[in-house]
């Protein structure tokens, strides 16, 4: 199975470290800023995994992240790093 990984970027430079590390496992990675992607676009992409990056602020400041976790978290594995992990807890 070819993995299709979505990284939701919460405006943090560490996002591209995640991109590089994950790229060693799977070349199929797309990165979108938390305010530049919609739930519909995520559904279209049909990701096998979602990574939610670190970022400044609080989960409520993380754009679409909480909505995405609520909608897709039951059937798509989601990894949250720092703010992303907090967003999982908030959702």
Swiss-Prot record:
Gene3D superfamilies: 3.40.50.880. Pathway: Amino-acid biosynthesis; L-tryptophan biosynthesis; L-tryptophan from chorismate: step 1/5. The active site is at residue 82. Pfam families: GATase. It is an enzyme of class 4 (lyase). Heterotetramer consisting of two non-identical subunits: a beta subunit (TrpG) and a large alpha subunit (TrpE). GO terms for molecular function: anthranilate synthase activity. L-glutamine binds at residues 55-57, 86. Residues 4-91 form the Glutamine amidotransferase type-1 domain. The keyword Amino-acid biosynthesis applies. It comes from Acetivibrio thermocellus (Hungateiclostridium thermocellum). This is Anthranilate synthase component 2. It comes from the Bacteria. Keywords: Amino-acid biosynthesis, Aromatic amino acid biosynthesis, Glutamine amidotransferase, Lyase, Tryptophan biosynthesis. The gene is trpG. Part of a heterotetrameric complex that catalyzes the two-step biosynthesis of anthranilate, an intermediate in the biosynthesis of L-tryptophan. In the first step, the glutamine-binding beta subunit (TrpG) of anthranilate synthase (AS) provides the glutamine amidotransferase activity which generates ammonia as a substrate that, along with chorismate, is used in the second step, catalyzed by the large alpha subunit of AS (TrpE) to produce anthranilate. In the absence of TrpG, TrpE can synthesize anthranilate directly from chorismate and high concentrations of ammonia. GO terms for biological process: L-tryptophan biosynthetic process. It catalyses: chorismate + L-glutamine = anthranilate + pyruvate + L-glutamate + H(+). GO terms for cellular component: cytosol. Its EC number is 4.1.3.27.
